[in-house]
């Protein structure tokens, strides 16, 4: 575990209700910031430099893009060392593939997320590089 001021930041964008991974994020060694919309997450990225970004992918119907995550993933270009994990409903796998073709992410996990898989990934990403 990192000392309190030395722990890396994890920004979680939780638009799908029904789960709380904050305790798991903290156990993996992160300071945690949670936003409930991409718009608020984009505002938060003006003052926060996260090591990990965890975002929900939910299929929304936009006329010009697959998801509002496109804006978030584009903003992540300012943080080249940040790791991006997308949590998704398996029913939207083809829509997620479209998004990832435009804006790559480091990993995806289907909902409901298996805590052990998430924890292993986060512990690996929490280690200093």
Task: List the predicted regions and their residue ranges.
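Non-catalytic signal-transmission and effector/linker regions of two-component phosphorelay proteins
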Residues: 1-24, 73-81, 114-129
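Structural motif
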Residues: 11-17, 56-59, 87-90, 111
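A generic structural motif
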Residues: 28-32
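Acidic, metal-coordinating helix/loop segments flanking the phosphotransfer/catalytic sites
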Residues: 36-52, 62
